[in-house]
Amino acid sequence: MEYKLEQHRHGLTVANDHNFKKDFEEFLDVITSITDQDIIDEFNKKTNTRSNSNRVLTKSISDAINKLIDERLTQKAWSRQSRIFGDRRFKDMRWTLDFAKQTNGIGTFCVEVVFNNAGSLGWNLLKPVLACEQNHVEKAIETKIGIIVLATKEMKVAGGFDNTVATFDDAPLYLSAMSNIISATPIVIIGLCAPKSFKIEHYEANYGNGRRKKAGRIVMI
């Protein structure tokens, strides 16, 4: 996949520092290693499965991209669903990071892949702050730089994403409004570009038992 980059609090400058550059390039390599065909294959794999004798259909390529990123990052020793706090009161999913990286026992990057409702973007942007800055609650991991992955507007349309999904283009506005809160944490914002060889077309699908619902299918371009 191709991508765009933005930064908050000199995120790109810090990410390219010699202490962090290797891990940052490793993350970007994972993104660029994902091809259109990889996404098509993963999308079709899920579409062709069945649950309780009904087809499992999906509307967008978000699940396919999430799975491909997960598989390739974990192969490179990035931790998935990494807890921010060690305190057991904060053990549920809302207090975890999508991914985190430690090198030589030191946390470097924390990652949120954001394909959900724009109303949740503020919380997704705050998680790196919790992971990177000092807190009176015991930390399970402490990182230095946040990475936020979003779809660009073009990817949102071509990939069949819901109209309410936050985009790369929304992030600067949120970060500007939250600048007094996200005041010190360096953050890199990555916008995933639309596939070049296909798009998702929505249609009314039969889910079985008379149920019809919008689903997506691959259309080559």
Named regions from a protein language model:
Residues 55-59, 67-105, 117-126, 133:
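Active-site metal-binding core of divalent-cation-utilizing nuclease and nuclease-like domains
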Residues 115-179:
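Catalytic cores of nucleic-acid endonucleases
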